[in-house]
């Protein structure tokens, strides 16, 4: 799966490297998968197989390194990620808590491996953890490296809220305690900065907004054939929380009033094994509505396929059923001049207000989405204006360069405010 957080972190690291900084992007759990040039290191720390074994069998918490290398190898981890295993938050409660306990958790050996490696590296000026679920590392890293610790925030609440009790409460308590070792949090949207400040009980002064940015190589504006079908698109992970079922319902309502003109609904994105039945059900619903021939799932796409897919759309919508904190898919669609219709929740309003690249409607309202599609279908001038505004807005505010500039300022401020700590 192309993970949105991995895409963001890899794009940021690549841009910082291009700007002359020394950057080490270290994979955790599994090798980084991105549809751009991968700048992450080859060695994976906290290999997913080791973490799992150490969680469930005490023997593996004490095995020597030469044995660990067998299941920490890249080939073994890649093989494991290809297995069709359901990975849902409820089944990961104990593991999440253990990881957040840091050196008191079952993965203490893995922390030792990471610290041993870091001691041999040139001294870092700052360390940035990719998400709050790794905050069990904050105190050990600060103690050993004597440098400021930052933590990106990019969607942890959805995972945490999906944990069964007592794991959710235990995890939140551990994150809140570990936050004392963090010098700055980097939420990827203003919405998420405000929300996570309250959710985690972290002072607003520790929140530093670090907007998303994308690498625009290859993102040229679409050239649509007006004689073809009006194409509504969905580009995100195929799962209930991303709202494909909401979009299918909206499309059916849209087609109820536009049967005289050709149209289609295209979807693309990663489909996890546990959500195959979800997609099958949606396909069946479209068939019952007499629209099966207009609905197509294109699968998971590489970078070239993704850009070509987006360029084939007249409008894109990902009506997420939760408050999405990122919305990289919006930036990618707008970058090729495709207008979007989105629910007014999460980070969507601030992205559209800043770019002007789409229409906001009430959340969980299929009729409102359908009306947005009809508005764009009936008014080609409006569709073109929104598409042009979105493309310009992304280039003005949401490039990898803009993201790197902001993060540079945050890092510099954190280093400047942090008094030098004595080294061991």
Where are the model-predicted features located?
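Carbohydrate-associated surface elements
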Residues: 191, 213
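Conserved donor-binding/catalytic core segment of Leloir-type glycosyltransferases
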Residues: 225-242, 248-252, 266
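Glycosyltransferase donor-sugar binding loop
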Residues: 264-283
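Nucleotide-activated donor-binding/catalytic signature segment of Leloir-type glycosyltransferases, i.e.
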Residues: 279-304
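A conserved catalytic-core segment of Leloir-type glycosyltransferases
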Residues: 25-116
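Conserved acidic donor-binding segment of nucleotide-sugar-dependent glycosyltransferases
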Residues: 354, 359-366, 375-380
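Short hydrophobic beta-strand element within catalytic cores of glycosyltransferases
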Residues: 339-342
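A short, well-ordered alpha-helix in the C-terminal region of glycosyltransferases
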Residues: 368, 375, 382-397, 403-409
């Amino acid at each position: 799966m192309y993970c949105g957080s991995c895409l963001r972190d890899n794009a940021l690291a690549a841009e910082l490297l291009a700007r002359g900084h020394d950057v080490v992007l270290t994979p955790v759990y599994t090798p980084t998968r991105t549809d751009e040039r991968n700048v992450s290191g080859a060695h994976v720390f906290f290999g997913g197989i080791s973490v799992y074994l150490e969680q469930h069998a005490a023997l593996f918490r004490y095995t020597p390194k030469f044995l660990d290398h067998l299941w920490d190898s890249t080939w073994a981890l890649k093989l494991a990620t290809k297995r069709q295993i359901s990975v849902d938050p409820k089944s990961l409660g104990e593991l999440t808590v253990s990881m957040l306990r840091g050196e008191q958790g079952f993965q203490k050996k893995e922390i030792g491996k990471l610290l041993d490696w870091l001691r041999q590296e040139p001294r870092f000026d700052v360390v940035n953890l990719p998400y709050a679920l790794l905050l069990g590392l904050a105190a050990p890293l600060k103690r050993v490296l004597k440098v400021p610790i930052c933590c990106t925030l990019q969607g942890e609440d959805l995972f945490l809220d999906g944990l069964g009790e007592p794991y959710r409460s235990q995890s939140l308590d551990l994150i809140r305690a570990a936050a004392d070792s963090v010098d700055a949090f980097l939420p990827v949207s203003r919405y998420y900065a405000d929300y996570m400040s309250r959710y985690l009980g972290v002072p607003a002064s520790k929140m530093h907004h670090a907007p998303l940015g994308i690498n625009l190589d290859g993102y040229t504006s679409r050239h649509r054939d007006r004689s073809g079908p009006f194409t509504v698109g969905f580009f995100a992970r195929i799962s209930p929380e991303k709202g494909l079922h909401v979009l299918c319902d909206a499309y059916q309502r849209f087609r109820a009033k536009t049967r005289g003109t050709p149209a289609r609904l295209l979807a693309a994105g990663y489909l996890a094994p546990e959500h195959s039945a979800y997609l099958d059900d949606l396909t069946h619903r479209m068939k019952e509505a007499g629209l099966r021939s207009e609905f197509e799932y294109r699968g998971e796409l590489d970078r070239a396929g993704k850009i070509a897919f987006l360029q084939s759309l007249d409008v894109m919508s990902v009506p997420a059923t939760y408050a999405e904190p990122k919305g990289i898919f919006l930036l990618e669609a707008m970058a090729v001049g495709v207008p979007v219709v989105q629910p007014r929740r999460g980070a969507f309003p601030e992205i559209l207000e800043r770019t002007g690249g789409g229409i906001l409607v009430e959340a969980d309202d299929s009729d409102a989405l359908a009306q947005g599609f009809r508005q764009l279908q009936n008014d080609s001038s409006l569709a073109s204006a929104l598409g042009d505004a979105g493309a310009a807005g992304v280039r003005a505010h949401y490039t990898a360069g803009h993201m790197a500039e902001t993060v540079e300022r945050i890092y510099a401020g954190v280093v400047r405010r942090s008094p030098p700590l004595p080294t061991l």
